[in-house]
Amino acid sequence: MLKLFVKYTSIGVLNTLIHWVVFGVCIYAAHTSQALANFTGFVVAVSFSFFANARFTFKASTTAMRYMLYVGFMGILSVIVGWAADKCSLPPIVTLITFSAISLVCGFVYSKFIVFRDAK
């Protein structure tokens, strides 16, 4: 399981870079709320994460159902973190770091035991 988590984390680094760049563009160029910026960054990055983890981490096929399960769960998590950040007036960098940490752990557990549970 540690080996899988290391692979998931490696892909997560690239995913995080994608998410952070989009988040920054939304906040500083488009002047959106943190909730919208976090969700938009998520939407762009989650597809990369899903397909890369399916192929390289879990060696599983990609299906519409798996994609919807993954995107749905991670999307809800993204909105919750963004909403909480707006309510607490957190600086954007704190929002990004918080979401990155939470989504790494929760995303791995959810992927391993729900989305890709049948993968060999």
Curated annotation (Swiss-Prot):
GO biological process: polysaccharide biosynthetic process
Localization, UniProt: Host membrane
Stated family: Belongs to the GtrA family.
Record's protein name: Bactoprenol-linked glucose translocase
Known role: Involved in O antigen modification. Involved in the translocation of bactoprenol-linked glucose across the cytoplasmic membrane.
Annotated transmembrane regions: 10-30, 34-54, 65-85, 90-110
Tagged with keyword GTP-binding: no
Gene: gtrA
InterPro entries reported for this sequence: Glc_translocase_bactprenl-link (IPR016480), GtrA_CellWall_Glycosyl (IPR051401), GtrA_DPMS_TM (IPR007267)
Organism: Shigella phage SfV (Shigella flexneri bacteriophage V)
Organism domain of life: Viruses
UniProt entry keywords in alphabetical sequence: Host membrane, Membrane, Transmembrane, Transmembrane helix, Transport
Topological category with respect to the lipid bilayer: Multi-pass membrane protein
UniProt keyword Membrane present: yes
Pfam family, one: GtrA_DPMS_TM
An example Gene Ontology CC term for this record: plasma membrane
